Amino acid sequence: MSDSLWTALSNFSMPSFPGGSMFRRTKSCRTSNRKSLILTSTSPTLPRPHSPLPGHLGSSPLDSPRNFSPNTPAHFSFASSRRADGRRWSLASLPSSGYGTNTPSSTVSSSCSSQERLHQLPYQPTVDELHFLSKHFGSTESITDEDGGRRSPAVRPRSRSLSPGRSPSSYDNEIVMMNHVYKERFPKATAQMEEKLRDFARAYEPDSVLPLADGVLSFIHHQIIELARDCLTKSRDGLITTVYFYELQENLEKLLQDAYERSESLEVAFVTQLVKKLLIIISRPARLLECLEFNPEEFYHLLEAAEGHAKEGHLVKTDIPRYIIRQLGLTRDPFPDVVRLEEQDSGGSNTPEQDDTSEGRSSTSKAKKPPGESDFDTIKLISNGAYGAVYLVRHRDTRQRFAMKKINKQNLILRNQIQQAFVERDILTFAENPFVVGMFCSFETRRHLCMVMEYVEGGDCATLLKNIGALPVEMARMYFAETVLALEYLHNYGIVHRDLKPDNLLITSMGHIKLTDFGLSKMGLMSLTTNLYEGHIEKDAREFLDKQVCGTPEYIAPEVILRQGYGKPVDWWAMGIILYEFLVGCVPFFGDTPEELFGQVISDDILWPEGDEALPTDAQLLISSLLQTNPLVRLGAGGAFEVKQHSFFRDLDWTGLLRQKAEFIPHLESEDDTSYFDTRSDRYHHVNSYDEDDTTEEEPVEIRQFSSCSPRFSKVYSSMEQLSQHEPKTPVSASGASKRDPNAKGPEEKVAGKREGLGGLTLREKTWRGGSPEIKRFSASEASFLEGEASPPLGARRRFSALLEPSRFTAPQEDEDEARLRRPPRPSSDPPSSLDTRVPKEAAQGEGTSTPGEPEATERSHPGDFCPPSKDGDPSGPRATNDLVLRRARHQQLSGDLSVEKRPSRTGGKVIKSASATALSVMIPAVDPHGGSPLASPMSPRSLSSNPSSRDSSPSRDYSPAVSGLRSPITIQRSGKKYGFTLRAIRVYMGDSDVYSVHHIVWHVEEGGPAQEAGLCAGDLITHVNGEPVHGMVHPEVVELILKSGNKVAVTTTPFENTSIRIGPARRSSYKAKMARRNKRPSAKDGQESKKRSSLFRKITKQSNLLHTSRSLSSLNRSLSSSDSLPGSPTHGLPARSPTHSYRSTPDSAYLGASSQSSSPASSTPNSPASSASHHIRPSTLHGLSPKLHRQYRSARCKSAGNIPLSPLAHTPSPTQASPPPLPGHTVGSSHTTQSFPAKLHSSPPIVRPRPKSAEPPRSPLLKRVQSAEKLGASLGADKKGALRKHSLEVGHPDFRKDFHGELALHSLAESDGETPPIEGPGATRQVAMRRLGRQESPLSLGADPLLPDGVQRPMASGKEDSAGGTEACTPPRATTPGSRTLERDLGCTRHQSVQTEDGPGGVARALAKAALSPVQEHETGRRSSSGEAGTPPVPIVVEPARPGVKTQTPQPLGTDSKGLKEPVAQIPLVPDAPRVRERWVLEEVEERTTLSGPRSKPASPKLSPDPQTPTVAPTKNVPRSAAPPVPPASLMVPGTKPEAGSNSRCPAEGVASAGLTKTGAPSPASLGP
C-alpha cells in the first residue's frame, strides 16, 4: 500500500509539516503525546483501569478536556501500530482496541470478543489466508510490533459499551466547550473543513457515481462517504476532538488496508484517491485542535510510560533518546524504517518485490475470464424467494458446490430495487466472519443478476422449528449466541440487517449458524468508539429516516411500524422475537392481517408459557429486554456487548462457540442433498418465468457493474491452478497403475494421464509422500489453528484429507462425530485379525450415546481379511498407509471425472476445513499409521463437494456402502473361463449390535487379466453386479449372478474408503452374531418402484400439496416406512440403501404436526433425484436430545395455546391434513433395551406450534388440533389401553386415523390424489380421489376401501350401503357379519401385530376375531361343511401382491415358532369370478427376526428402535383354487385367544401373520395341517 497515504495527521503537534511527509506515517509524535499510556502501560505503578479513561485522572468526566481528550486514544490500536517502533507509543493499544481485529471498532468486543480470538478457529481454509488472518485476527500484529500482548484476553478488560467517561453528558459538554474555543480561535479552518466535507460527500456519494464493480471496494467507498458525513455532522454540533480525528484517520487507514488486501481490482486507485482527499480535508483542523489540546504534563507521563514499555518489551535496549526523538517526529527521514518495519509486520507485503509479485498475480488473475453462468452447472433448486430463486450449482473446473442466487432483473427494475441488489452484493463480499455466509462472485446474465455464495447444507432454523417445534434451551442458546456474534460483526461495520428471522439463519453441516439474505439490509456508519456518548446512541437508533416498513411482519420493530427513524436496535428487536420463537415454538405476536399484527406489536404484552412449559427466568428476562418498545432502552442499543453480558449467557464461552459440538447435525444423503430446505414452490411461481425473454433494452447502466469476483474465489481458483501444477510431477509406476475409470473420456492415454496424477501411484512410489515436507508443513499449519477465508476446492480439500489421515483406518477410537470411512490396506504386515469395520453411529442399531461419533461397531473379520499379499516387496505399515492415502486421493480425483489439471492435490500449508468456519472440522492428522486421529476428516464419504460451508456432507448413515455417486459399472469381458478377479464376502456389523450384513469386496485382481484391463481394483467394495445391488446377498448368490451373465459382466465398485465402513479390532462375541439377510431381488427396478409406490406410507407422503416430506427433521420421529426393503424380503432388517432401516421416518411430516411444506423438491417421491439413490428418510439428526424431549413438545403458550393465529401473510391454498402429532423419537443408536418415557409422550400428542409465517398452511385444522390436545390424549389413552407404541412410539397410520374418528375438526376439507392407494389385483381399478366438504377419512382407514373391487359396496356398521358407491365420509366399517369382515393391513410398514378393526374397545374386535377364524380354516383345510352358515359361501382371502404385475417369489423360510418348525406362508386360492362380494383379507405383516430358532420369544417390548434383524413377510402370490391349502404358522393364536382391538398386541416375533382368527365360539387349533 502506498506509504504516502498513511499519515495526514502524522505531525499534528508540529508547527509545520516536514517536507514530503504529509501523508507519511512518520513514527511521529502525532500520537506520542496524546496517548494515555499510563493506563495501558505495563508499569506496575500505574494501575490499568477498566474504562477507557485514564487511570491517573480518576476517570472523572469533569476533568478538563485538556487532560481528558488526549488520553482516550490510548484505547485505539491504530493501523499504523504495525510500524513496530510503536508509533504513538502504540502501547496505547496494549489492553485495547480491536482495530487490528476483524471489526472496525472491536473496542466493542470485550475480552470475549467474537472476532478477537477467532484466529484459533479455522474457518475457511486456504493457506493464502493465513497472512490475512494473522493480521485480521490480531496474531502477527500483536507479535511483531512492540505492543506484542495487546490483544491478549487478559489485557482486554473493558468494552466500549461500558465506557463510563464517554456517556456522561458532562463529558459531551466539555467537548462542546473545547469546540467553542476552537471555533472562536480558528473560525476559517472550521468553516473551510465543513464546506469541503459537504462538497466531498455530495460529489462522491454512491448514488452520484457508478457503483464500483468490486464488492469490497464498493462497501469501502460507502463507508468513506459515511465517515465524511459523520465528521461534518460532528463539526456542526461542536463535538469534534482530537481523539475523534485520530479514530477517523484510523478507520480510513483500516479501510484502505482492507481494500489493498482484499481486492485485486484496479478500482483500488479510486478508493485511495477518496481517502487521500478526505485526509487532506481534515488535516489542518486536526493539527490545530491537537495543538489546542496539548497537555505538557500528560506528555511527560506518556514519555515515562513509553520508556518503561520500551525497556520491558526489549524493543529498544540502548538508544532510548533516539527512540523518543523518533516518536516525537523529529527524524526527517523515516522511510527506510517504515519499509523495514512493514516488511517485518506484514511479511513484506509492501516491499517492491512483493508488490511486483502481487501485481503479477493479480494481472494473471485479471487475465482469467471473469466468472459467468457458463462456469457453473446447475444441480437443482434449493429455494424460492420473492425476487428470485437459489440454486445448488457446481463449478465446472473446481467441482466445488455453491449456492447461486438468481434475481430477476426485470423484477428489480420494476420495483426500483437495483441499488438494494448492489448493497447485498457488497455486504456479502465484504463480510468475513464465520457466522455470516460468504460470497464468491457475482455476474449478470441476460435476465438475471447472479450471486454465487457458499452452500450451507443444513437448511434454515425455520424449517427446524417447523419440524420439531420449540428447541431445547441449550440449543436455542447456542444458535442465538452465534447470531449475536454475526450481528455484532455487522453492526460494527454499520450494517443493519433489517430482516432477521429464523428463515435467514442457516445451519452448517457442523450444526453452527450462518446469517444470510442481506436483500433488505442498510449500510450505515461503521462503529466509532468516539461515538459512544449518549446523544449518539440516540442518533444511532434513528440512523435511517426513510420511513420504509420492510421486513417480515412478525419480526418488524415498533419504530419501523410507526415510521420513525430506526437503526441497529431493529435487529435486536427481531432477535428477541427469534429467541422467543426458539424457546416457545411460535412468535409472540399474531394477527390475521398485518395491521392486527402491528397493533399487537405496539401495544400488547407478551404471553409467556406457564407451568411445566415456563421458560427459564433469565431467558424470559432477556427476551423482555430485547422486546422493549423504546429502541433507546432496548438491550443491544449500546452494542452487542450488553447482550453478551446478560445472565442468560452466564456460562457461555463466547470465544469457543465454534468449538462446541452442536446438538443438531444435518445428515446428508449425498453431496447434492437439499432436503433440509423448503423449496417454497407453492408460494413463489417465478421460477418458470425465468426462461421467458423479459429483458428490456433500456436496463439501467449500473447493472453492468454487478459482476465481481471476491478474493475468496480468486484464492480458490489460484490454489486449484497451483495444485494442478504439482500433480503431474508425481512419479508413476506402470505396473501398479490400473485404470480406475473405464468411462474416462478420450483414449487410454487420457486415462493413463489421470493415473499419473496423485491417484495412480502404487506402493513403491507412494512411500515418499508420508514424510514429505509438504505433508509435514501441512500438518503443522493445521495444528496452528489459523485458517484461511476462502473455501478450498473440493478436490484439494478432499484429497489432502485423504493424504493426511492414514491413521484413520487403523484407529479404533474417534472422539469426534466424524465416524469416518476406513480403507483396508491391501498389503499389510499388521496383525491381520484386528480389523474392525465400523458403521457410523447413526446407522448403528446398537446402544449409542448421544454423541454422534463414538466408536460404535466392530466387525470381526477372519485372519487375513483385507490383507492380500503385496506384490511390492516389503508390505510395511507405512506403505499400507500410503497406499490407502493415495488410493483415496486417486478415487477423489477420478470419481468426479476430473482431469488431473482440474483437481490437483493441495500443496502443503492449507488447512483442511470446511468453509463454514466451523472449527470443529479441523483435522490434525497424524502420519503415524497407528495413531488415532482426534478429529477425523470433515469430508463425507459420499460427497465430492468442496463446499466451504460446512463439513461437506455428513457421514453416511447407511448400512450399504454409501457412495455419493456410484461410478459407472466396469464391464469385464471374459477371455476363456476367467474374469481375472477374486471376490470375498465380509461381515459388516451394525454399530455395537451383533447383527451384521454381508458385503463383497474385490479381493485380488490378476495382473494382465480381463478385470485389470477393465479397470477393476483390488480392495474395492462391489455394490452392484449387472445393475443388481449385491449388498446383503450371500457369497454364492453373487457368484451365481456373475456366472449367469455369460462372457460379459458389469461390476460397479467403489473404493473402500469411500464407504461408511470402518475397520476396527476383531469381534469377541462373533458367536452371537446374526446375519441381517436380504433376499436377492428377482425383479427389475421398475418392479421395485411400483412396490414402493404401493406402500401405504409412500401413498400418504405423495400428497404433494398437503404433506411435503421434510427430511430434515424427521429425526424425532422415526418409523418403519419400508421405503426400500420389500415386505417380502426376509431381510427386511437391512435394505440395500436404507441407512438406518429401523429408523426410517414416518411419512415425514405426517407425524410432524404442522404439516410442513416440503423442504426439498426431491424429498417425497421415490424417483426424485435426492431420494433415488437412497429411498429412505433421514435418520436421527438431533443427537442427544432425548433427555430434553419433554421440553421440546410442551404446548406453545399454555393458556392461549388455542389462539395462535396464522401469519397475516399466509396464503397457502391447501388446507392442512389432520396429520398425526409429532411423536418423540430417540437419538440414533438407541439401545436395544426397553426404554421408558413419560406417559404423556405416549398418550397426549405433543403440540407443535405453527410458525405463523407465510409458508404455513391455513390455520384451522392445526389449531383445532391444538385445542383438542387433551381430548386427543384421552382418546388415545382409552383406545390404545396405554399400550406403548412400537418403533419410536409412533401410531400406525390406520391407528392414527382410527384414534381420531371423533374429531371432526381434525380432517381437512381437501384430499389429495396421493391419498387413494392403487388397488391391485385382477379387475381392480384405481379409485379417483375426490374433494368433498365435510369430515373425511383416508380410504385406508374409513369408507373407501381400497381393497374392494369396483362395484362392490363396502359394508357398514349398520348394514346399510353408502349410496355413493363405496366411499363413505364418516362411518367406520364394522364387521358384524361374516360376510362383511375387513382386515386392514399397513402395506408399507411392519408395525401392528393385532388385527385392526375400526371398532373401539375390545368387544367387537373379539367377536370379529372369533367370527373370522372358522371360515378361513374350513376353507383352507377343505373341511368346511356344506351345512355351514346358510347362505354364506366360502370367503376367499386375497393376499395382495406388493408389486402389481410383478411376480413375487415365495420367500425363503420366514421364521419359525419357538420349536423351530418352519411354516410356509398361507397360499390362498383366488376366486376369479366370485358370485358375491369378494372380501379382501389382508395379512398384517409383523416384525421378523432373522434368527431361525431359539428359545420361545416373548412379545417384544416396545422399543424406540426396532430390531435390526426383523425381516418382513412377503405377500404371497394369488394361487389357483385347486392349489393345496396352505398351512398357517404355528405361532397363530391358540384356541380361545382374544386379541384386543386397537392395542398393539403383538404375536411372538417369529410369527408370520395374524390370520388365525376365531369365529365366535369356535375353537381354533394352533396349527392346521393340510
Curated annotation (Swiss-Prot):
The protein's name in its UniProt record: Microtubule-associated serine/threonine-protein kinase 1
The protein's Enzyme Commission number: 2.7.11.1
Family matches, as CDD domains: PDZ_MAST1, STKc_MAST
Annotated spans, Disordered: 23-80, 94-117, 139-171, 341-377, 717-911, 931-967, 1061-1186, 1202-1294, 1307-1570
Binding site for ATP: 382-390, 405
Family as reported in the entry's similarity comment: Belongs to the protein kinase superfamily. AGC Ser/Thr protein kinase family.
Gene: Mast1
Lineage: Eukaryota, Metazoa, Chordata, Craniata, Vertebrata
Compositionally biased intervals (Basic residues): 1069-1082
Quaternary state and interactors: Interacts with the microtubules. Part of a low affinity complex that associates with, but is distinct from, the postsynaptic density. Interacts with SNTB2.
Phosphothreonine found at: 351
Enzyme active site: 499 (proton acceptor)
PANTHER family: MICROTUBULE-ASSOCIATED SERINE_THREONINE-PROTEIN KINASE 1, SERINE/THREONINE-PROTEIN KINASE
Cellular component, GO, one term: dendrite
Residues bearing PTM Phosphoserine: 90, 139, 167, 346, 689, 895, 954, 1414
Gene3D superfamilies the UniProt entry points to: 2.30.42.10, MAST3 pre-PK domain-like, Phosphorylase Kinase, domain 1, Transferase(Phosphotransferase) domain 1
Ranges where the AGC-kinase C-terminal domain occurs: 650-721
Ranges of residues in domain PDZ: 969-1057
Residue stretches of biased makeup (Low complexity): 105-114, 151-170, 933-961, 1104-1132, 1149-1174
One Pfam family, short name: PDZ_6
Regions of compositional bias (Basic and acidic residues) in chain numbering: 738-779, 1083-1092, 1278-1294
Enzyme class: transferase
Entry keyword annotation includes Membrane: yes
Distribution of this protein across tissues and organs: Both isoform 1 and isoform 2 appear to be restricted to the brain. Isoform 2 is strongly expressed in the neurons of the subventricular zone and granule cells of the olfactory bulb, Islands of Calleja, hippocampal dentate gyrus and cerebellum.
UniProt KW keywords: ATP-binding, Cell membrane, Cell projection, Cytoplasm, Cytoskeleton, Kinase, Magnesium, Membrane, Metal-binding, Nucleotide-binding, Nucleus, Phosphoprotein, Serine/threonine-protein kinase, Transferase
A biological-process GO annotation: protein phosphorylation
GO molecular function: ATP binding; magnesium ion binding; microtubule binding; protein serine kinase activity; protein serine/threonine kinase activity
